Amino acid sequence: GKWWEGSFKQGGFTHGMTRGFPERGGRHGDDGLKIGREGMEPIEKFVDHAIAEKKPFFLWYGVFLPHTPHNPPQRLLKKYKDQGHPISVAKYYACCEWFDETCGQLIKILEKRNLREDTLIVYVTDNGWIQNPKRNGYAPRSKQTPYEGGIRTPIMFSWPNGGLAPANRPELVSSIDLFPTVLAAAGARCPNGVPGVNLLENLQKKHPIKRQGIFGESFAHDIANLKKPEASLLFRWRIEGKW
């Protein structure tokens, strides 16, 4: 899927679709961007390979939906056009549903192989929609802003045999919490000094997550100075309490 770090091997992955060549289309993930839009076969092959090797697996499904290009199937586009939405909005909504369908296909791949109950699924996204359909730039209070549309997104965990009871948690968490939490679920040791909080026990026992606040930074889309990252800094923000 979407992968900005060059070859998948640079991220420690053994398998992947992204070549990372410095060529047209390589910025977001070249061949990896086909996943979801053109089927799920590479994922099926990878899961089957892990089964054949009798090894656990980590799968990154960074599907390039509902990101542009907004080219949903006509059956989905018609559904939202018929509701009276502007064409740009109808395309976006249709791509959201298309993405949702591929998530269902991914779950079916696990179910078909009797892996679903023992597989931890983590859903995370980066930012909300650029909400002004008439503008190609960044809409106020949306992507790349310190406001809710830019930084408040859902994180979901599902692990049927992992003791995670259904719950809607209001506490503050951050994507930096995913690494220590996933390591704990896998029974692996977390390196010292890693930022983030291991949420596994909180999720299993419904213990409150005691955190006063979370912090973050927002940077400009284009880097101003490779040797001075702070030159592109736009915002520093802190969230605390009920938000």
Predicted regions and their residues:
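Catalytic-site neighborhoods of secreted/periplasmic enzymes
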Residues: 1-44, 139-142, 212-215
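Short, solvent-exposed turn/loop segments enriched in Gly/Ser/Thr/Pro and often Arg
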Residues: 1-10, 62-68, 123-129, 195-197, ...
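Beta-strand elements within well-structured catalytic alpha/beta cores of enzymes
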Residues: 57-62, 96-99, 103-106, 110, ...
